[in-house]
């Protein structure tokens, strides 16, 4: 990955926060909201974009009769995130 090849997913602070949180494992929508301090609407829009790009998946279920959405990073998302981190490290090492 080169600087000119950075995916749009990494050009948003909120999307970066979401992917950073998910790299350690799946999170509920509520957990991501707490971590990112984003509004429901903004978080939902960014998760949808990441899902459309194949970076995350969402699973809806019921826990004690309450709906819950779990978001997981995909293999593609993990690879892209790690490549992005490597690129940042390279840029920092070159300065």
Indicate residue ranges for each PLM-predicted region.
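Amphipathic alpha-helical dimerization/coiled-coil segments
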Residues: 2, 78-95
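N-terminal helix-turn-helix DNA-binding core of bacterial DNA-binding proteins
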Residues: 2-42, 64, 68-70
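Beta-hairpin "wing" of winged helix-turn-helix
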Residues: 51-67
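Basic, amphipathic "hinge/linker" alpha-helix immediately C-terminal to the N-terminal HTH DNA-binding motif
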Residues: 62-83
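Residues within the DNA-recognition helix of helix-turn-helix
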Residues: 46
